[in-house]
Regions:
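Generic secondary-structure boundary/loop-capping signal
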Residues: 32-33, 55, 96-97
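N-terminal export/ancillary region detector
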Residues: 48, 56-60, 65
Length: 182
């Protein structure tokens, strides 16, 4: 059983949910893309005028209070991709909000979290990588984009080389001509 389910970008929906749960006054509570129980019925609320945060504003994940060395590594199933995702620990980041391509017929490109393409600057991404390495001691990164932008991947790689940091990183891609042997 769940009391609330939020959809898509999570920062603002979770912030509003926190405010709603902590609310002690009788004022209209605002939600963003949230399912909840109201009068014994599941209802969808999207009654805020606030906009989602820009990707450059969301900051770096903070794992400082987690005992990362106490977590077990679990391989979910024999699928090699699931093994890659689950075996060991990967710091998770996003290169871009939305999709740079936006033309796949299997994807619902009408959804804001897909159609509103907003890449993060390579410098900011590598800053975040360095913060996570310092915090977690782990230098493996999984960029969780559905399809990472090739031009941005190149910029990130060049920024990593420029800073002389040693990392392992991977992401999902769309195969296209912009990829070179370089």
């Amino acid at each position: 059983f769940f009391d609330f389910i939020t959809l898509d970008d999570g920062e603002l929906p979770v912030e509003l949910l926190f405010e709603a749960v902590c609310q002690t006054e009788l004022v209209e509570v605002q939600f963003k893309r949230t399912f909840l129980i109201e009068n014994n019925q599941v209802v969808y609320k999207n009654n805020t005028t606030r906009h989602d945060y820009k990707q450059a504003e969301v900051g770096t994940p903070d794992y400082s209070d987690l005992l990362l060395d106490k977590y077990i590594s679990v391989i979910e199933i024999a699928n090699p991709m699931h093994s890659l995702w689950s075996d060991g620990r990967w710091n998770k980041l996003t290169m871009a909000h939305g999709c740079y391509w936006g033309k796949c017929t299997f994807c619902d490109i009408s959804l804001d979290y897909i159609k509103l393409y907003e890449p993060i600057a390579a410098k900011i991404l590598v800053d975040r990588m360095e913060e996570l390495i310092a915090q977690t001691g782990e230098n493996g990164f999984h960029f969780v984009d559905e399809a990472a932008p090739p031009a941005l991947m190149r910029e990130v790689a060049l920024e990593i080389i420029k800073r002389k940091i040693v990392v392992t990183w991977w992401t999902n891609i769309r195969f296209e001509k912009s990829f070179t042997a370089d």
